[in-house]
Amino acid sequence: MQVIVALAALSSLAAPALGFSIPRGVPVSQSMIDVKLSATGNSMVKATITNNGNRALNLLKFHTIMDSNPTRKVSIESEDGKEIQFTGMMPTYKEKDLKPSYFISLPPKGTVEHSFDIARTHDLSRGGKFTLKAEGMVPIAEENGTEITGAAKYHSNELHMTIDGEKAASVENAFGIVKRGPRSRITKRTSIDMQSCGNSQELQALTAALKASAQLSSMSAQAVSQNQDKYMEYFKDPQYMQTVQSRFQAVAQESSSTTGGGTTYHCSDTMGGCEEGVLAYTLPSQNEVFNCPIYYSDLPPLSNECHAQDQATTTLHELTHNPAVQEPFCEDNGYGYERATALSAEKAVQNADSYALFANAIYVGC
């Protein structure tokens, strides 16, 4: 098959694969940590995280309420029940060789506080009454360690805030984003920002990753109905098969060209979001994707290892975050194999990494 041959040729260039996340079979606790939200200003929120256990823990900050990047930490609904648009970043982090600085150490019964301004990542200019809550799963290492040994789910209290819209509008957005009109969706294929490509190697790598993303997504769309056991492993419920298949088809189409479409893909970081450990990130409110330096230096083009990260599936992951590809766009509900496969069907079908991991599994034969 031509697609398999092309992908095999690309994977032959791969460096050793990168794996992660919560190792298979590690315990997931429902009550190990507690998260309480409180308002400390017009749009300022404080999260107080408490270790309920009797041993010290190292909590990984990535994709949690403690993330220092302008990520979605809380869901926000207006008084009429409508979700407020998120204007921050959705990063993909490197999952191997985690550094101590990526963790927060919490002694038994100890607490740590993390404050953030929700106006930096949400349009709250209308003002009024809003309801906030946070939920997620924190990977955990033992005291002074960086090897993930477990995870803790958290569900915060509901926080009700009355926000002054004018004051909220005066807060600078994390990426200086201003409102734009809707993008044309006549041709749904990505466009590479050539000016962001500092050298031919970056452009070549991104072009190859998009091609592989298109091929992997096409294979995965077919596998949804042809490999139902694998589908159920990642997405749990047959009623979502059409939704999953449609998203893979949309990603395949979006990845199939580099000269025009609903998303803009940047070879490099032109918005300043590439903090340490970030491979790539998406601004879903703008339908833009940005690669970081370690996307090129630390990832193989295409991995032959199960549950591993590579350039192709990272690009596929990022494209699912864009509403121009398919709405509603995917969130980061569960990152890595163990967390992704622990999600409910409703969460999995809207989880970016579930699609990347499924594509990897179909290609590798996991």
Swiss-Prot record:
Disulfide bonds join 197-267, 274-292, 306-366. Residues 1-19 form the signal peptide. It holds the Pfam family Peptidase_M35. Residues 20-189 form a propeptide. Its main location: secreted. One of its GO terms (cellular component) is extracellular region. Its EC number is 3.4.24.39. One of its GO terms (molecular function) is metal ion binding. It is an enzyme of class 3 (hydrolase). Coiled coil: none annotated. Keywords: Cleavage on pair of basic residues, Disulfide bond, Hydrolase, Metal-binding, Metalloprotease, Protease, Secreted, Signal, Virulence, Zinc, Zymogen. One of its GO terms (biological process) is proteolysis. Binds 1 zinc ion per subunit. Its cofactor is Zn(2+). The active site is at residue 318. The keyword Signal applies. Zn(2+) binds at residues 317, 321, 332. SUPFAM superfamilies: Metalloproteases ('zincins'), catalytic domain. The keyword Hydrolase applies. Belongs to the peptidase M35 family. Probable secreted metalloprotease that shows high activities on basic nuclear substrates such as histone and protamine. May be involved in virulence. This is Probable neutral protease 2 homolog B. The gene is NpII-B.
